[in-house]
Amino acid sequence: MDFPSIKIKDFEGPFDLLLHLIKKNQMDIYNVEISKITNQYLKYIDDMKFMDLEITSEFIVVAATLIEIKSKHLLPKIKKDEDEDEEDQEKNLIEKLILYKKIKRVAEFFKDRYVNSGELYTKKPEIIEEINLPNNNEDIFKNLTLLELYNMYNNLLEIYNNKQNKANVIQKRIYVDKYKIEDKLEYLLGLIENNEVSKFSEIIDKCECKLECIVSFLALLEMVKLKKVRVYQSDSFDNILIERRQDEGEE
């Protein structure tokens, strides 16, 4: 027996499914074709039943609402009040969809911030303290022309403005423990295990940034301190060569 091919995607709720269908059909959220969306929504519910997946009451409620709105579109309009009820019902559904879309976007924003928060530290903007100059400033202004004084004032003003953090946001991220000495130590030990002599320049070439270069160098110093390796140069400013010590750990 051949079973139909059905693709089921997990949705957080009925509005998540509706937004997916609207996006899939390239519709404007403010001008949704209820009839088309209803058919696809009900098809998804049928697929869930076929796959014996649990259907929550929220999906059923929205399905009933869509069917009611669609049926009112198809039936002849008799009274003005009924037209208004139909418009209100459809309007309420669209408003809930728009609200859900906004909430979902905000939730994704905070989720990204939460995930990234473990990788960095932040600090509050610095308060620039005024410099207390001595009471007697006569020596500072001796032999200064008016133009020099004017340029000095402009330079100080520019420095002060550049130090102001008007956005109240620290743009630079300081990553925490992305490169650890312990990890580099283990990496270097594995490297010299497989090679009789290793060039430090080749290790540096594989580093992603300046910070990783520094951590690699500190790890090398730690290895020398622990008497794990011997480092030497053939000449000044030549390659730093790393060699595993045969008398490892001995004085």
UniProtKB/Swiss-Prot annotation:
A single Gene Ontology CC term: cytoplasm
InterPro entries: ScpA, ScpA-like_C
Primary location group: cytoplasm
Residues passing through the membrane, by range: none
Record flagged with keyword Lyase: no
GO BP annotations listed: cell division; chromosome segregation; DNA replication
Key words of the record: Cell cycle, Cell division, Chromosome partition, Cytoplasm
Quaternary context: Component of a cohesin-like complex composed of ScpA, ScpB and the Smc homodimer, in which ScpA and ScpB bind to the head domain of Smc. The presence of the three proteins is required for the association of the complex with DNA.
Protein family membership: Belongs to the ScpA family.
Function: Participates in chromosomal partition during cell division. May act via the formation of a condensin-like complex containing Smc and ScpB that pull DNA away from mid-cell into both cell halves.
Protein name: Segregation and condensation protein A
Native source species: Clostridium botulinum (strain Eklund 17B / Type B)
